[in-house]
UniProtKB/Swiss-Prot annotation:
<feature type="compositionally biased region" description="Basic and acidic residues">
    <location>
        <begin position="1310"/>
        <end position="1325"/>
    </location>
</feature>
<dbReference type="Pfam" id="PF01751">
    <property type="entry name" value="Toprim"/>
</dbReference>
<feature type="compositionally biased region" description="Basic and acidic residues">
    <location>
        <begin position="1332"/>
        <end position="1359"/>
    </location>
</feature>
<dbReference type="GO" id="GO:0031507">
    <property type="term" value="P:heterochromatin formation"/>
</dbReference>
<dbReference type="InterPro" id="IPR001154">
    <property type="entry name" value="TopoII_euk"/>
</dbReference>
<dbReference type="GO" id="GO:0006265">
    <property type="term" value="P:DNA topological change"/>
</dbReference>
<dbReference type="InterPro" id="IPR034157">
    <property type="entry name" value="TOPRIM_TopoII"/>
</dbReference>
<feature type="site" description="Interaction with DNA">
    <location>
        <position position="743"/>
    </location>
</feature>
<dbReference type="InterPro" id="IPR020568">
    <property type="entry name" value="Ribosomal_Su5_D2-typ_SF"/>
</dbReference>
<comment type="subunit">
    <text>Homodimer. Interacts with mod(mdg4). Interacts with barr. Interacts with ph-p. Interacts with mle; the interaction mediates association with the MSL dosage compensation complex.</text>
</comment>
<feature type="binding site">
    <location>
        <position position="523"/>
    </location>
    <ligand>
        <name>Mg(2+) 2</name>
    </ligand>
</feature>
<dbReference type="GO" id="GO:0000819">
    <property type="term" value="P:sister chromatid segregation"/>
</dbReference>
<feature type="binding site">
    <location>
        <position position="101"/>
    </location>
    <ligand>
        <name>ATP</name>
    </ligand>
</feature>
<feature type="site" description="Interaction with DNA">
    <location>
        <position position="641"/>
    </location>
</feature>
<keyword id="KW-0479">Metal-binding</keyword>
<feature type="region of interest" description="Disordered">
    <location>
        <begin position="1183"/>
        <end position="1231"/>
    </location>
</feature>
<feature type="binding site">
    <location>
        <begin position="129"/>
        <end position="131"/>
    </location>
    <ligand>
        <name>ATP</name>
    </ligand>
</feature>
């Protein structure tokens, strides 16, 4: 052939080898490589007495032949459980290895078919094995019939010794020359203990070695430890020394020792013997995924499906833990958790398969394992506490920071893909530091700015509109930041880079814009947007605020014009000062600018022409600025924010008392302001307004949006029902509402809702589908299709006679709603309230209006009021007072025949549909962890009643019934309620905490009594003036008819003088009105009046008359006008009929006046209470009659259907009076009583104590009320409603207690609270609707009222703080635990007029309702857990987060 090579013959080219020759020729197919390999391996280090991982050089083939012998020895343990010893001797000097084990020996007998001894056959002949029967399930390492023969083949000497007592013989034979030669068999009699020994000398030449070096000996030694760990009950000796590894746990410790750092805590190992075939351990890994695993004593270095089986199960459960703790919102994937695990697995697998003879990777499918590894809940819990969760989250945070850094901007002359950006021509170029980016509040403001660019040019100025309020990035997580398009766009437009510091002006040159100018409305929400932008920059680039980088552009909020004179005012206090100093201010035309959109393009150009006046620089003034920004926006500074707001309210009150003007920022000479001044003088106004929107007034129980609705309804005084959509438009018009009408519609709907858990007294009547307890009001119809009208009770509560006494506000010259109305009972207790503002939140339960009236009568009579408990109209469950303002509430359960259960009431705030989906469905269908216990459940409820009839799977009824409190626990029908979070604004507009409902009642009583005195005085004056007027008119007519008085053909002055001479008075009614105005004006000077946001808010009459002196104004009236009430009468008045009518009217007024003078203010109040209670009885009686009438018709109709269907076919029934269509509870049912044990009370107190400590670590706790003695049951219950439209039905906090069946149904009761003397008796007049209460935490969303934004339609309302989340059913109590009321959750989304219970409003500007940053999902609540011997008590603890600044 070519190159002179001799051609090979056919015989030389195609050869046949024996199997022995093939093994020696191609060893890598059988034992792996025979070349030296460098790998990172675990080896045993004698000097350190532990496993070390290091790079060693070894021959895999040599290692494998040793391992085959060792695994054979370990396999013997599976054949003979009495085996307990393995002895391994490694002699590098003699190149000899020996493995000895006791236990059953190899049969020393002749094989009848092969005609040789069994040991000779299995060690000296290929393809022989005891593992060929696949029908036999074995958990040994041998499988293919090579094993020990391979060791024989690659050895120069291979000796087998075995002895068996069964055959009474011992065997010995030696092979040499790579199994090519065999010595004669030596057979001896034997009567000792069975054993087997293999001794071999590896053929080092085959492995290109000359001796057994240190690395291979270390690796072999490690395998000795492996076998000691993976072979239970076997002692392993190495070179005569017994190894100190007693079990798998000891073996793991040898590895962990190597990773412990003396300077830090030791690594926590979590170990578990899952079952007899699986033993698992795990710990955190900082080197990526690591595993040490064994299958039937075989070391699987590369892992395999047995490892995947364990790891996948572990990761799945750890991900659930991570989801709860992953506040960063990062999407953590399974492989990312895997990278933080170090797993140890020792398992026995039936007939395992591997990807090669080297057996490094187990490939058998999981279904063939013969067993499963199920990790216990304890193992998962311990793993979650081992540091693995923290490691994964820390890595996720680190990765998120790197990912966020990549999203930053860079300097470039042109950027694309950002809609609505008007980029400066020089942005990103050489003159970029001279460029200014104008950030506007919405598109309308952008139009204004673009108009201004016509004056200043577009080379150095760019404009970008914001879509609402920016995200509060200070506590934002990765997901929020990465998905927030607006923040990413800002970084790109400005060129900001995360993690970069901007310290000098040279650093500013790296940006696309050298300045940012904020241009927002001059209202409180505009201030909030400025603050959020400042916070955004301060959080990421605090050094940037120290440079002249940030500016604001201010515009007038009021303009006063007169002829050619135009005055601009940039704050309302400045405008008020000007009015006080300008006598002729009323001659000016006043125009209020509610937003930038009010200004015209011409005005925009005027603003930009006077840039020096309108541009204000933010100036850094040291650490006080940093501290102020952090205080305003950090979640950790809630208490500081409370102090900040309290100081602001005190300062406003003090300045009022001293007659000082309000402080304001923007004077005529203002060129710059500090960040601290902005926070303390401007942003504080938004925070205070946010509280006013979110927290009701103690006086009338209303929030501003609700008050605007009621003002409009009173003003319209409709006699016919009006469509809700039309009413909302009317509210916006009449009450100067400046935001979208959708939130008003929601407010109207919620004022009219009357299902269980909503209002105890609905002020508006629902005409149409306003929502039901089926879905908590979310099932209401569109505002276009439903109608409403004032309830007949409303004007009895908010009495028209009080209207003249109220202080009405003025907005843009328009008289709008008063600061507060003055109901005759405290409506804040009747209908309760919930809201989350800045620094504070409130939760006031509903109380029984009849109890409230009863207590008011007691107080009027000088007695102390009785303790009141929460009460919810038409709620049939029960509630018991425990201690410290906490109640335990339950639904109703009855046992029916046939071991069936009936649920006839749910906790307040638990809606029927949600309960079915979240509780009954899982109990019926089962979950991943728990099998279903219900075989069937049937529904018989309506929109107002609840009835589920439940059948159980075999044995489940008895099991649950035998458990104390079992039914209530399983069906999640018991929760707790706290009344320790009651905040409200008092009559002076100061935010206060009220420890109990009685404190609210007493505070209300003082004010209401004072105003009854004012009402009496007012009415006395009014009736006196009216009587005087009628008397003069009647006398005038008589004297005129009798010719005593002649007015014809006289001059006006002479005529008026004649009237005065004859004792006629100038118009008594006008004179009385003038006196009232003068008194109001004087009082306004002397007393501390309430503050107002937009215009003077003390009495409008007082303020206006203060500006125009009523005394002077009256004197200016001509005499004729003063006597117009006489001289202006028509000729018809001179008739006898009219004369008699006037006299009758006069006598009636005098009679009314006499009657009024005989009454005290207290008597007037009692009359009003009697009238209200009478009407309340009438209304509720009518409601009951209508409901019973409907139910009766329904029952009759369904009974007829049932009879008709029964004639034709057999109707399947669950028996025992639970017929189809029966909406009423079964009268034969046996009620299940819930028993509150001392243990439950102690657990509640302990859990509440921990929760309080977690919330307020530095604040002293409120004093606890004395313990309550248990009283006999039978009293009327009170319960708290959950009139939530968008509740999250949290069944994750349930009371575990005792329950037992009682022989009779018991009335709902409330346990006595300290101080109550007598049990309250149920009134016959309807006051005693059977009551109880359940509060599913977060389920009840009481009136959340805000005036600043528009809410999305009801269908899917985004939750601000508690967005819908997966319900956890594991805990014991669901209690807000809001002791001290210092939850302080500020919610930025809380700016809507939607007063639906716990339905947070969506934050957004009216004209940009579709924009804005995405809302953060309600953060999950922390849990305070008290560990006990029995169970854990868990209480949901409000996360003190300032949502107000966490958009």
């Amino acid at each position: 052939m070519e190159n002179g090579n001799k051609a090979l013959s056919i015989e030389q080219m195609y050869q046949k080898k024996s199997q022995l020759e093939h093994i020696l020729l191609r060893p890598d197919s059988y034992i792996g490589s025979v070349e030296f390999t460098k790998e990172l391996m675990w080896v045993y280090d004698n000097s350190q007495n532990r496993m070390v991982q290091k790079e060693i050089s070894f021959v895999p083939g040599l290692y494998k032949i040793f391992d085959e012998i060792l695994v054979n020895a370990a396999d013997n343990k599976q054949r003979d459980k009495s085996m307990n010893t393995i002895k391994i001797d490694i002699d590098p000097e003699r190149n000899m290895v020996s493995v000895w084990n006791n236990g059953q020996g190899i049969p020393v007998t002749m094989h009848k078919e092969q005609k040789m001894y069994v040991p000779t056959m299995i060690f000296g002949h290929l393809l022989t094995s005891s593992n060929y029967n696949d029908d036999e399930k074995k958990v040994t390492g041998g499988r293919n019939g090579y094993g020990a023969k391979l060791c024989n083949i690659f050895s120069t000497s291979f000796t087998v010794e075995t002895a068996t007592r069964e055959y009474k013989k011992s065997f010995k034979q030696t092979w040499g020359n790579n199994m090519g030669k065999a010595s004669d068999v030596q057979i001896k009699d034997f009567n000792g203990t069975d054993y087997t020994r293999i001794t071999f000398s590896p053929d080092l030449a085959k492995f290109k070695m000359d001796r057994l070096d240190e690395d291979i000996v270390a690796l072999m030694s490690r395998r000795a430890y492996d076998v000691a760990a993976s072979s239970k009950g076997v002692s392993v000796f190495l070179n005569g020394n017994k190894l100190g590894v007693r079990n798998f746990k000891d073996y793991i410790d040898l590895h962990i020792k190597n990773t412990d750092d003396d300077s830090g805590p030791p690594i926590k190992i979590v170990h578990e013997v899952a079952n007899e075939r699986w033993e698992v351990a795990c710990c955190p890994s900082d080197r990526g995924f690591q595993q040490v695993s064994f299958v039937n004593s075989i070391a699987t270095y590369k892992g395999g499906r047995h490892v995947d089986h364990v790891v996948d199960n572990l990761i799945k459960q750890l991900l659930e833990v991570l989801k709860k703790k992953n506040k960063g919102g990062i999407n953590i994937k399974p492989f990312q958790v895997r990278n933080h695990l170090w797993v140890f697995v020792n398992c026995l697998i039936e007939n395992p398969t591997f990807d090669s003879q080297t057996k490094e990777n187990m490939t058998l499918q999981q279904k063939g394992f013969g067993s499963k590894c199920t990790l216990s809940e304890k193992f998962i819990n311990n793993m979650s506490k081992s540091g693995i969760v923290e490691s994964v989250l820390a890595w996720a945070k680190f990765k998120a920071q790197n990912d966020i850094a990549k999203t930053g901007g860079r300097k470039s002359s042109k950027i694309k893909g950002i809609p609505k950006l008007e980029d400066a021509n020089e942005a990103g170029g050489k003159n970029s530091i001279k460029c200014t980016l104008i950030l506007t509040e919405g598109d309308s403001a952008k139009s204004l700015a673009v108009s201004g660019l016509g004056v200043i040019g577009r080379d150095l100025y760019g404009v970008f509109p914001l879509r609402g309020k920016l995200l509060n990035v200070r506590e934002a997580n990765f997901k929020q930041l990465s998905e927030n398009a607006e923040i990413n766009n800002l970084c790109k437009i400005i060129g900001l880079q995360y993690k970069k510091k901007y310290l000098t002006e040279d650093d500013l040159k790296t940006l696309r814009y050298g300045k940012v100018m904020i241009m927002t409305d001059q209202d409180q929400d505009g201030s909030h947007i400025k603050g959020l932008l400042i916070n955004f920059i301060h959080t990421n680039w605090p050094e940037l605020l120290r440079l002249p980088f940030l500016e604001e552009f201010i515009t007038p909020i009021v303009k006063a014009t007169k002829k050619n004179e135009e005055l601009s005012f940039y704050s309302l206090p400045e405008f008020e000062e000007w009015k006080n100093d300008t006598a002729n201010h009323h001659t000016y035309n006043i125009k209020y600018y509610k937003g930038l959109g009010t200004s015209t393009s011409k005005e925009a150009k005027e603003y930009f022409q006077d840039m020096d006046r309108h541009r204000i620089l933010f100036k850094y003034d040291g650490s006080v600025d940093d501290e102020s920004i952090v205080m305003a926006f950090s979640k950790k500074h809630i208490e500081s924010r409370k102090v900040w707001l309290t100081n602001h309210m005190d300062e406003v009150k003090r300045r009022k008392e001293l007659g000082l003007p309000e402080r304001y920022l923007y004077t005529k000479g203002t060129k710059s302001i500090t960040y601290a001044d902005f926070i303390n003088l401007e942003l504080v106004l938004f925070s205070n307004a946010d509280n006013e929107r979110s927290i009701p007034s103690l006086v009338d129980g209303l929030k501003p949006g609700q008050r605007k609705v009621m003002f409009t309804c009173f003003k319209r005084n409709d006699k016919r029902e009006v469509k809700v959509a039309q009413l909302s438009g009317s509210v916006a018009e009449m009450s100067a509402y400046h935001h979208g009408e959708v939130s008003l519609q929601m407010t109207i709907v919620n004022l009219a809702q009357n299902f269980v858990g909503a209002n105890n007294i609905n002020l508006l009547e629902p005409r149409g589908q306003f929502g039901t307890r089926l879905s908590g009001g979310k099932d209401c119809a569109s505002a276009r299709y439903i109608f409403t009208i004032m309830s007949p009770l409303t004007r009895l509560i908010y009495h028209p006679l009080d209207d003249p006494l109220l202080d009405y506000q003025v907005d843009d010259g328009q008289k709008i709603e008063p600061l507060w109305y003055l109901p005759i009972i405290p409506m804040v207790l009747v209908n309760g309230a919930e809201g989350i503002g800045t620094g504070w939140s409130t939760k006031i339960s509903n109380y029984n209006p009849r109890e409230i009236m009863k207590n008011l009568r007691k107080m009027i009579n000088g007695q102390e009021p009785s303790v009141m408990h929460p009460w919810y109209k038409n709620f049939l469950g029960r509630m018991e007072y425990v201690s410290d303002g906490r109640y335990i509430q339950t639904g109703n359960i009855q046992i029916l025949s046939g071991n069936r259960l009936e649920i006839s009431e749910l906790p307040v705030g638990v809606w029927t549909q949600n309960y079915k989906e979240n509780v009954l469905e899982p109990l019926s269908n089962g979950t991943e962890k728990v099998k279903g216990i219900i075989s069937e459940y049937r529904e018989y409820h309506t929109d107002t009643t609840v009835r589920f009839v439940i059948s159980f799977a075999p044995g489940e009824f008895e099991r649950i019934h035998a458990e104390e409190g079992g039914f209530y626990r399983v069906f999640k029908l018991t929760t707790t309620l706290s009344t320790n979070q009651m905040h409200a604004f008092d009559q002076n507009n100061c935010l206060r905490r009220f420890p109990t409902a009685i404190d609210i009642l007493k505070e209300y009583y003082k004010l209401r009594r004072e105003y009854y005195a004012r009402r009496r005085d007012f009415l006395v004056g009014q009736l006196t003036a009216q009587a005087d007027r009628l008397s003069d008119q009647a006398r005038f007519i008589l004297e005129k008819c009798e010719k005593k008085l002649v007015v014809e053909n006289k001059q006006r002055k002479a005529m008026c003088d004649e009237l005065l001479k004859r004792g006629y008075r100038p118009d008594p009614v006008k004179e009385w009105q003038r006196r009232i105005k003068m008194e109001d004006a004087e009082q306004a000077d002397e007393e501390d009046e309430e503050e107002e946001e937009a215009a003077p808010s003390v009495s409008s009459k007082a303020k206006k008359e203060k500006e125009v002196d009523p005394e002077k104004a009256f004197k200016k009236l001509t005499d004729v006008k003063k006597f117009d009430y006489l001289l202006g009468m028509s000729m018809w008045m001179l008739t006898e009929e009219k004369k008699n009518e006037l006299l009758k009217q006069r006598d009636t007024k005098l009679s009314e006046l006499e009657s009024l003078r005989k009454k005290t203010p207290e008597m007037l109040w009692l009359d009003d209470l009697d009238a209200l209670e009478s009407k309340l009885n009438e209304v509720e009686e009518k409601e009951r009659a209508e409901e019973q009438g409907i139910n009766l018709k329904t029952a009759k109709a369904l009974k007829g259907q049932k009879s008709a269907s029964a004639k034709g076919r057999k109707v399947k029934s669950m028996g025992g009076g639970a017929g189809a269509g029966d909406v009423f509870p079964d009268p034969d049912g046996e009620p299940v009583e819930f028993k509150i044990t001392e243990e439950i009370i102690k657990k509640m107190a302990a859990a509440a104590k921990v929760a309080q400590a977690a919330k307020e670590p530095k604040k002293p706790k409120e004093p606890k009320e004395p313990k309550v003695k248990k009283e006999p049951k039978g009293k009327q219950i009170k319960a708290e409603p959950d009139a939530s439209g968008d509740e999250v039905d949290e069944f994750d906090a349930m009371v575990e207690g005792g329950s037992k069946t009682s022989p009779k149904a018991k009335k709902a009761v409330v346990k006595k609270e300290p101080g109550e003397k007598k049990p309250r008796q149920k009134k016959e007049n309807g006051g005693g609707l059977k009551q109880s209460k359940i509060d599913f935490s977060k389920a009840k969303a009481k009136k959340s009222d805000d005036d600043v934004e528009e809410v999305t339609p009801r269908a899917e309302r985004p939750g601000r703080r508690q967005a819908s989340k997966k319900i956890d059913y594991s805990s014991l109590f669901s209690d807000e635990e809001e002791d001290g009321g210092n939850v302080g959750s500020d919610d930025d989304g809380n700016a809507s007029d939607d007063d639906s219970p716990k339905r947070p409003a969506k934050r957004g500007r009216e004209d940009e309702s579709s924009g804005g940053a995405k809302k953060k999902a309600p953060p999950k609540k922390r849990r305070a857990v008290i560990e006990s011997d029995d169970d854990d008590i868990e209480i949901d603890e409000d996360d003190d987060d300032d949502s107000d600044f966490n958009c």
